Amino acid sequence: MSMFKEFRDFAMRGNVVDLAVGVIIGAAFGKIVSSLVANIIMPPLGLLIGGVDFKQFSWILKPADGAAPAVVMEYGVFLQTVFDFVIVAFAIFMAIKLMNRLYTKKEVEKPVAKPSAEETLLSEIRDLLKEQNGKAQ
């Protein structure tokens, strides 16, 4: 089997294609959440705290020295990233919870199958044999 054919077979399996679609949608969803946090959630939150822009929160570890730039720890950007993570994690949690609920409903709604004619006959034979063995003793 040629390497190209093996790769094609691998890439066209359902799981790989589904995974690729999931990664692409996840990346797009991540951008939406980042925009939501940076442009919608953080500005009003900063306003409530007193007109604070979280992106400006930083510690200067070493000031700029001539041509060397300052060494800065930008914890405000980190806080925004934490908000991004919490929102994405909550959205994934809700999606999984919904999927689990739908899955359990399908299991509950599954009707109990009636025994086949063969199973019914075998059950009757078993019961008769038990009855005969009980009388013999």
Swiss-Prot record:
What are this entry's molecular-function GO terms? mechanosensitive monoatomic ion channel activity
Q: Where are the transmembrane segments?
A: 10-30, 76-96
What's the protein's topology in the membrane?
A: Multi-pass membrane protein
Tell me, in one coarse class, where this protein mainly resides.
membrane
Q: Keyword check for Repeat, yes or no.
A: no
Describe the function of this protein: Channel that opens in response to stretch forces in the membrane lipid bilayer. May participate in the regulation of osmotic pressure changes within the cell.
Q: How does it assemble?
A: Homopentamer.
The protein depicted here goes by the name Large-conductance mechanosensitive channel
- Biological source species: Erwinia tasmaniensis (strain DSM 17950 / CFBP 7177 / CIP 109463 / NCPPB 4357 / Et1/99)
User: Source gene?
Assistant: mscL
